[in-house]
From Swiss-Prot:
<feature type="repeat" description="TPR 7">
    <location>
        <begin position="458"/>
        <end position="491"/>
    </location>
</feature>
<keyword id="KW-0175">Coiled coil</keyword>
<dbReference type="GO" id="GO:0120170">
    <property type="term" value="F:intraciliary transport particle B binding"/>
</dbReference>
<feature type="repeat" description="TPR 2">
    <location>
        <begin position="45"/>
        <end position="78"/>
    </location>
</feature>
<comment type="function">
    <text>Required for polyglutamylation of axonemal tubulin. Plays a role in anterograde intraflagellar transport (IFT), the process by which cilia precursors are transported from the base of the cilium to the site of their incorporation at the tip.</text>
</comment>
<keyword id="KW-0970">Cilium biogenesis/degradation</keyword>
<feature type="repeat" description="TPR 8">
    <location>
        <begin position="543"/>
        <end position="576"/>
    </location>
</feature>
<dbReference type="InterPro" id="IPR011990">
    <property type="entry name" value="TPR-like_helical_dom_sf"/>
</dbReference>
<feature type="repeat" description="TPR 5">
    <location>
        <begin position="392"/>
        <end position="423"/>
    </location>
</feature>
<feature type="repeat" description="TPR 4">
    <location>
        <begin position="188"/>
        <end position="220"/>
    </location>
</feature>
<dbReference type="InterPro" id="IPR039941">
    <property type="entry name" value="TT30"/>
</dbReference>
<dbReference type="GO" id="GO:0005879">
    <property type="term" value="C:axonemal microtubule"/>
</dbReference>
<dbReference type="Pfam" id="PF13432">
    <property type="entry name" value="TPR_16"/>
</dbReference>
<comment type="similarity">
    <text>Belongs to the TTC30/dfy-1/fleer family.</text>
</comment>
<keyword id="KW-0802">TPR repeat</keyword>
<dbReference type="GO" id="GO:0042073">
    <property type="term" value="P:intraciliary transport"/>
</dbReference>
<keyword id="KW-0966">Cell projection</keyword>
Length: 664
């Protein structure tokens, strides 16, 4: 008989070879050998049993269930195969089939308790929490032949899981913590406890257990290659082995990434995902795929949409997938796609969208065709949320008066959750008037919400923007921009470049030139330090600040100074020329050319020569820089040769020559 690689297996050695492969966890190779053997002896009980075991270990649960189905038909007297089939069906998320198969074992006292545990797990996975609780409590009260410490421990863990699903996170923490103390270190229990802490916003406690899982996994299984992908080491996939599953490393890294994302440490969240044991994309579990899509959306939106759309076709998928896909469609203004997905998946709407999220999405989609109607819908939603916020404010005050720490924490968490729902509604209302350039109305909307939002960074930032846009409220804008900048003053490049630029312009427009210069020196100094630490990294903050200041002077008609500032801001071109910086620069040039063509301004020859030289430099360095970042789901893509800084530089240079000849 031929073995792996075509080498013959000596007579009588086949079974030994298969068992050695299984002993060494080389299940895929064992499957290959067993598959060949079963083609010759399809009714072999040993072959089918080992094949089912290997498939189960490889987490190919549907294939394992098929093997046990065949064994059940060939050997109906051996009821363990019915149990194995039910377990494999459950793991494959085929819950109705698993329930049907397991019911036939309930009357067998040998398997009664194991079947009850399996049925409780099925009901839990289906979302039938009362049914699951009933079975768990039945198990705890009945006991059985395998009753005792282990059974009691499992029961307490199961109760912890039910408490978690019911939203009783503190009680769930107590159950998991007690179970962990009773059992000693177990990765799955540590993860459960970390998840419960995460859901109750105790991130430090959650991270403590996550770090323990990761460190334990690295020590016990260095072969899993934790962190190697982040370090740029080319490593092969470790596959979806049972060992990987037992370490809870994938779950721990996903939870750590979620915590970093919640804390707005987006780079750390992305790095956490690449730290997990390496697997091929087709091997990734749904949660990892979902998190990859979400956390890399800004850099790779097309890929992110593809992953979320793919997940929506899988059963099961992470429950957040449906809502996140719809929200991202709205963020990128694909309202038609959002409406189509809602219409095509009405059955998912009731299961995965809260009434709040459904109403919010409905209003966002309506914005495209009927902004006035959308505003009314959003106003209704905002009114409901403000009532909740006032009620929760009162609850917090009462709890503080009564010195009830538990009630204070609960009310404050509910308040924060409600505020996080209110802010997007408020911003969606404001955006309707922002798009109409009705900035006083936007300001009015924000002022109505000051009672709840005056400490919220997103609210303060947008108030600053709307004051800045009115051009006569620079002093008020400074009052909102300054705290944002000072909060991150020691790491100023963490602040958005446009915020720094707008603050500098506001200083200049209110004759606070010294403050503007001090801020610009601070930005320049930090950029120089960062360039020293990482010479290849492109940093645009100082450049964008200068571009915006140059744009301001151009807008005021001082093109000589404004254009000169724009040109100098992009030096050196290999580090400062990018899609964003080119956007600001070309706007100034287009404004300049428009005014020249209308004979409204006349530039000195030296300035024109400086402009031509600048565009020639952009032409040279802009060959591989997109002039425009295209929307991720556009069907008609721009011509790749035209969507470059080089192409647009040539167009602008040609226009300059045309206008100069015309003037002459």
């Amino acid at each position: 008989m031929a073995g792996l690689g075509g080498e013959p297996i000596p007579d009588g050695e086949f079974t030994a070879v298969v068992y050695r492969l299984i002993r060494d966890a080389r299940y895929a190779e064992a499957v290959q050998l067993l598959g060949g053997e079963l083609q010759r002896s399809p009714r072999s009980r040993a072959g089918l049993s080992l094949l089912g075991y290997c498939y189960y270990r490889l987490q190919e649960f549907a294939l394992a269930a098929e093997c046990y189905e065949q064994l059940r038909q060939l050997h109906p007297e051996l009821e363990q195969y019915r149990l194995y089939q039910a377990q494999a069906l459950y793991k494959a998320c085929l819950y109705p089939e698993a329930t049907r198969v397991s019911f036939l074992l309930l009357d067998n006292p040998t398997y009664h308790n194991r079947v009850l545990r399996l049925q409780a797990a099925i009901k839990y996975s289906e979302g039938d929490l009362p049914g699951a609780r009933s079975l768990v409590e039945q198990l705890l009260s009945e006991g059985g032949e395998d009753s005792g410490g282990e059974n009691e421990l499992d029961g307490q863990v199961n109760l912890g899981c039910l408490l978690y699903k019911e939203g009783h996170y503190e009680a769930a923490c107590s159950k998991f913590s007690a179970a962990l103390q009773a059992s000693g270190y177990r990765p799955d229990l540590s993860y459960n406890l970390a998840l419960a802490y995460f859901s109750s916003r105790q991130y430090a406690s959650a991270l403590k257990h996550i770090v323990e899982i990761i460190e334990h996994g690295i020590r016990q299984h260095p072969e899993l290659g934790v962190g190697m992908t982040t370090e740029g080491i080319d490593v092969r996939s470790v596959g979806n082995t049972l060992v990987l599953h037992q370490t809870a490393l994938v779950e721990a890294f996903n939870l750590k990434a979620a915590i970093e994302y919640q804390l707005r440490n987006y780079e750390a969240a992305q790095e956490t995902l690449t730290d997990m044991p390496p697997r091929a994309e087709e091997e990734l579990d749904p949660v990892t795929l979902h998190n990859q899509a979400l956390m890399n959306m800004d850099a790779r939106p097309t890929e992110g949409f593809e992953k979320l759309q793919f997940l929506l076709q899988q059963i099961p998928f992470p429950p957040e997938t449906f809502g996140n896909l719809l929200l991202l469609y709205c963020k990128y203004e694909y309202f038609d796609l959002a409406a189509d997905v809602l219409a095509e998946n009405a059955h998912l709407t009731y299961k995965f969208l809260t009434p709040y999220l459904y109403d919010f999405l409905d209003a966002m989609i309506t914005c495209q065709t009927a902004p006035e109607e959308a505003f009314v819908k959003l106003d209704g939603l905002a009114g409901m949320l403000t009532e909740q916020l006032r009620r929760l404010t009162k609850q917090v005050q009462e709890a503080r008066h009564n010195k009830d720490d538990e009630a204070i924490k609960k009310a404050e968490n509910e308040y924060d959750d409600t505020l996080e729902k209110y802010i997007p509604v408020l911003m969606a209302q404001a955006k309707i008037y922002w798009n109409l350039e009705n900035y006083p109305m936007v300001e009015k909307i924000f002022r109505k919400s000051v009672e709840f939002c005056n400490d919220h960074d997103v609210w303060k930032l947008n108030v600053a923007h709307v004051l800045f846009m009115q051009e006569n409220k620079y002093k008020e804008a400074i009052g909102f921009y300054e705290p944002i900048v000072k909060k991150h003053y020691d790491n100023i490049l963490k602040v958005s470049a446009i915020v720094l630029a707008n603050l500098c312009v506001s200083y200049i427009m209110t004759s606070q030139n010294e403050e503007a210069e001090e801020l610009m020196r601070k930005i320049e100094k930090e950029e120089e330090q960062l360039s020293y630490d990482d010479p290849d990294k492109k940093i645009y903050h100082f450049c964008i600040v200068n571009l915006v200041i140059g744009t301001l002077y151009c807008a005021k008609g001082n093109y000589d100074f404004g254009i000169s500032r724009v040109i100098k801001s992009l030096e050196p071109y290999n580090k400062k020329l990018g899609t964003d910086t080119w956007y600001y620069a070309k706007r100034c040039f287009l404004s300049l050319l428009e005014n020249m063509s209308k004979h409204m301004i006349v530039l000195r020859d030296s300035v024109i020569q400086e402009c031509v030289q600048f565009l020639e430099h952009c032409e040279l360095y802009g060959r591989n820089i997109p002039a425009v970042i295209e929307q991720p789901l556009e069907e008609e893509r721009m011509h790749t040769g035209k969507n470059t800084v080089t192409y647009e530089s040539r167009e602008l240079k040609a226009l300059i020559y045309e206008i100069i000849d015309w003037n002459m």
